[in-house]
Regions:
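Short loop/turn motifs that connect adjacent beta-strands in outer-membrane beta-barrel proteins
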Residues: 22-23, 27-39, 76-84, 96-97, ...
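Transmembrane beta-strands of outer-membrane beta-barrel proteins
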Residues: 39-49, 70-72, 84-90, 120-126, ...
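Residue-level detection of beta-strand scaffold positions
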Residues: 40-46, 68, 80-81, 106-107, ...
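Detector for outer-membrane/organellar transmembrane beta-barrel domains
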Residues: 80, 140-231
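Cleavable N-terminal export/targeting peptides
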Residues: 1-41
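Outer-membrane pore/translocation modules
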Residues: 49-65, 86-183, 254-272
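Predominantly the C-terminal beta-signal and adjacent terminal strand-loop region
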Residues: 200, 223-282
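Outer-membrane beta-barrel architecture
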Residues: 43, 70-72, 104-110, 150-154, ...
């Protein structure tokens, strides 16, 4: 089952990568975008409900949403490899998760395999939030902490508007097990206004033994619509943007087993999330 899910996910990402040029909103990537010595982003935003990789926490854990602030720094690593260093702080408005600050951090090594397609692999740390809370609540760790290693592919073609990602995660502390996340979408540049894009994407997540021994299946399915507004800059690779969004999230067939192992209603069956994010890229 896990092998089948991985095969289907990889095939779907390959299909997105091979998407045909539709001729609308062509905005080619600047030639130097991948060769910058240093680049990065800073963001601040609000989401009406907290979700960990699109698995929405229940109203017991968080009902009124979460504010987040974070950033990412991209530096040269070695030869044609880059490194991405990211961090994010989350402040929960209410619920059991609001009793503890939440912090995520990551380090990834990145290599461009082909134009617009890159490999990334590294380490992630989650303090608090859904993985951190359940790590301690379920007795998997003495602290509200989860750690994992990750590897995956990311595709982004600003010219033709197709984007997608396939990420494989293995949790080795706290939440122990496998997770696979697949996302794919299409961006229409200037469809609404010359400075307003439209992005439509969909995704899903599959896990094996991550939430509990023998728990395997699809964790969630989601559809997201976003309308990035370019305030400054000539394209999405740099400058300031404001991104309102709406997202529909459905829990997968692992939801009952997740609740059983957690001993509580930890995730939602269905939720509509709305939010906004301000992002500055340099």
């Amino acid at each position: 089952m896990k092998a089948t899910a991985l095969f289907l996910a990889a095939s779907a990402l390959a299909a997105v990568s091979a998407g045909a040029y539709d001729g609308y909103g062509y905005d080619p990537r600047p030639a130097s975008s991948y060769n910058k010595t240093i680049s990065g982003a800073a963001h601040i935003g609000y989401d009406s409900r907290y979700a960990y990789k699109d698995v929405v926490a229940s109203s017991v854990l968080n009902r009124s949403g979460v504010f987040n602030i974070g950033g990412e720094l991209n530096l040269n690593l070695a030869r044609d490899w880059k490194q991405e260093i990211g961090a994010e702080y989350m402040a929960f408005c209410d619920g059991l998760l609001s009793d503890k600050d939440a912090f995520d951090a990551s380090w990834k090594a990145v290599k461009e395999l082909f134009p617009n397609l890159s490999f990334r692999g590294g380490y992630e740390l989650n303090y608090g939030g859904l993985p951190g809370y359940l790590s301690k609540h379920m007795g998997k760790a003495p602290h509200s902490l989860a750690q994992s290693v990750t590897a995956g592919l990311a595709y982004d073609d600003p010219g033709h508007g197709y984007f997608g990602s396939l990420d494989v995660q293995y949790g080795f502390y706290g939440m122990i097990g496998w997770r696979v996340d697949l996302n794919a979408g299409k961006r229409w540049s200037g469809l609404i206004h010359e400075k307003v894009d439209l992005e439509l994407s969909a995704g899903t997540g599959y896990s094996s033994s991550y939430w509990g021994p023998g728990v395997a299946g699809f964790d969630q399915v989601n559809i997201k619509l976003a309308a990035p507004v370019r305030v400054t800059g000539v394209d999405s690779s740099r400058g300031f943007r404001v991104i309102p969004f709406i997202q529909l999230d459905w829990a997968g067939n692992t939801r009952s087993e997740i609740r059983r192992y957690a001993g509580m209603n930890a995730i939602e069956d269905f939720r509509i999330r709305v939010g906004v994010e301000a992002v500055y890229r340099f």
